[in-house]
Amino acid sequence: MKRIIISEFMDEPAVEWLKEQGFDATYDPGLVDRPDDLAAALEADARALIVRNRTQVRGPLLDAGGKLEVVGRLGVGLDNIDLETCKTRGITVLPATGGNTVSVAEYVITAMLVLRRGAWFGTSEVTAGLWPRQKMIGQEVMGTTLGLIGFGEIAQAVAARAQAFGIRVLAHDPFLPGDAAAWRGAERRETLDEMLAVSDFVSLHTPLTPETRNLIDPGRLAAMKEGAILINTARGGVLDEAAVAEALRSGRLGGAALDVFAEEPLPAGSPLDGAPNLLATPHVAGVTEQSNVRISWLIARGVAGHLS
């Protein structure tokens, strides 16, 4: 039987299905925190490895997996996988493209509504007997402008939902041809800075590459519309966290929703600790009960098909 190692959480019916197809599937979501055990498991003739974003598929781990044929990624970001080495060694990498689109898009819209309205943060005061009605008056999203950095599948899903709220949608994506049909869903902007200057919300939807690392830096934050809300569900390294924290404290940013960070979990003493108007979540924008099922079955079937 061909052996499959699953090092992070996966929908268990999909794991059982792999076993029913005749595969020796080892499911241990704690392996991600025991790299030596994971390497040992791969050395035992593993043909497939299924991961999320925490398992670093590179260096010693790839060396241990000498018989690996395929890596299944329970998600879409691939920056935790050494794609060049996988390509050189003939290891196929399968992302769960489309599996978490709805989840991420709904997270972005939710963050926009929560941060724009603001009243949702009044619970502790109200239940303590205070009545901060004037303080809790927020703003509507109708008539505002959303700027999307990157206009792939997830950003397009965000655009469609935002337009249903009466939000104007702009997008900047230098890799999407100007005549692409997708542009019917947003107004194209040639330069990032011109979009930032007029956007009430800015949402990041770009992979982490040498070109996008710290894309949102102090200069870009200064170029944004004062009081704008920044949302990052892409990768932590695409923005300067210290600069974002400072912009929140100074009021330059009206709010931020950050689901991804340069280092996860955040280290002690992070500049984001205590920053006002910050909605911080532990890399869960794409993880819902429904998306976990979709992603797990996409990868289970993809890996099984490859090994068969």
Per-region residue spans from a language model:
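An N-terminal-biased, well-structured beta-alpha scaffold segment characteristic
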Residues: 1-94, 217
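C-terminal helix-to-coil terminal segments
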Residues: 2, 87, 94-107, 132, ...
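Hydrophobic Val/Ile/Leu positions in short beta-strands of Rossmann-like dinucleotide-binding domains
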Residues: 6, 146-148
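Glycine-rich, N-terminal phosphate-binding loop of Rossmann-like dinucleotide-binding domains
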Residues: 8, 52-53, 75, 199, ...
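Short beta->alpha connector loops at strand-helix junctions that form conserved
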Residues: 28-30, 74-75, 91-102, 173, ...
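Rossmann-like adenosine-cofactor binding region
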Residues: 42, 57-60, 174-271
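Short, Asp-centered acidic motifs that coordinate Mg2+ and/or phosphate
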Residues: 47-48, 70, 201, 229, ...
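Phosphate-binding beta-alpha-beta segment of Rossmann-like dinucleotide-binding domains, i.e.
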Residues: 89-91, 97-145, 153, 157-160, ...
